[in-house]
Amino acid sequence: MKISLDQTQAKDKGEFLARFYLTKEQSDDASVIFVECRTRHYKTKMKGAKRMYFILGGSGSFIINEKQETANPYDLFIISNGETYEYSGAMKMLELNVPATDSSNYEKLD
């Protein structure tokens, strides 16, 4: 299966843009999102899934469970079930969720 950019659904949240390549409605196994962070992503707690961010370009920082790390191209960040995270900077990232997630799999904390 191939999914092209023109087949994705985009959600512009202002601080970041998300393009949904594979959603929970399409697959229970995983969800895949291209994220373009413009400024920041609010603090979030994961519920019932693992979320991974692969940095494609740009730079910034991630805070996972109150520990801050710099983010550069080709870095991978892994957020497990129950962990909190937020990020900031100007970055392009691939987000992978296992199993697939929707709004029931995270809690916005700020």
What are these regions (language model features)?
Residues 65-82:
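Short acidic-glycine-tyrosine-enriched beta hairpin
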